[in-house]
Amino acid sequence: MSVAKIADAYAEALLELANSNKSLKETTNDMNIVSQFLANSSDLKKFLGNPLITRERKKNVLKDVLGEQISSVSLNFLMLLVNRGRVAFLDKIAQKFLELSYKQDAIEIAKVTSSVALSAQQQKELAGKLKLITGAKKIKLALRVEPKLIGGFTVEIGSKLIDTSIRGQLKKISNLLGA
């Protein structure tokens, strides 16, 4: 089974659970925390994906790291993923859940990667411009800092990519010159 299908299945199941428990907002917030945590900690991602580490150890680390920050329902979901050997896909599952949750509320997710952290004002202006471009009622920014971009940022909304980074511009110039 492909990673996308696995992520879809678990994300849909969690969405159904959150809707039936009337805890969609809380679960969405929890998955946002999980997603941001994984985006900022490549060590945790590697740890969870390592098949040599026992399930018990993975559970203990997840409880220690996220136990105080997320609801018991979300934590139990993470434990289920560990038990079923699917915790390596947690990042994709959380992203898919957020997409489904936001789509249900007519919110577009924009994955923004910038060379430096964006200020609150920059985030607000970017969200406003993306709202105009997409026609969405609301834009949710998923922020990530990637110094390799040199300058500027990239925005990914659905299958569209807007690349204003210096690295992207240098790549275009390189392709034009045939280097």
Swiss-Prot record:
Keyword vocabulary terms for this entry: ATP synthesis, CF(1), Chloroplast, Hydrogen ion transport, Ion transport, Membrane, Plastid, Thylakoid, Transport
Disulfide bonds: none
Topological category with respect to the lipid bilayer: Peripheral membrane protein
Zinc-finger keyword on record: no
InterPro entries assigned: ATP_synth_OSCP/delta_N_sf (IPR026015), ATPase_OSCP/d_CS (IPR020781), ATPase_OSCP/dsu (IPR000711)
PROSITE patterns: ATPASE_DELTA
Gene3D superfamilies: N-terminal domain of the delta subunit of the F1F0-ATP synthase
Subcellular location: Plastid, Chloroplast thylakoid membrane
Entry GO MF terms: proton-transporting ATP synthase activity, rotational mechanism
Main subcellular location: plastid
This protein's GO CC annotations: chloroplast thylakoid membrane; proton-transporting ATP synthase complex
Function: F(1)F(0) ATP synthase produces ATP from ADP in the presence of a proton or sodium gradient. F-type ATPases consist of two structural domains, F(1) containing the extramembraneous catalytic core and F(0) containing the membrane proton channel, linked together by a central stalk and a peripheral stalk. During catalysis, ATP synthesis in the catalytic domain of F(1) is coupled via a rotary mechanism of the central stalk subunits to proton translocation. This protein is part of the stalk that links CF(0) to CF(1). It either transmits conformational changes from CF(0) to CF(1) or is implicated in proton conduction.
Record-stated family: Belongs to the ATPase delta chain family.
Subunit structure: F-type ATPases have 2 components, F(1) - the catalytic core - and F(0) - the membrane proton channel. F(1) has five subunits: alpha(3), beta(3), gamma(1), delta(1), epsilon(1). CF(0) has four main subunits: a(1), b(1), b'(1) and c(10-14). The alpha and beta chains form an alternating ring which encloses part of the gamma chain. F(1) is attached to F(0) by a central stalk formed by the gamma and epsilon chains, while a peripheral stalk is formed by the delta, b and b' chains.
Name assigned to this protein: ATP synthase subunit delta, chloroplastic
The gene coding this protein: atpD
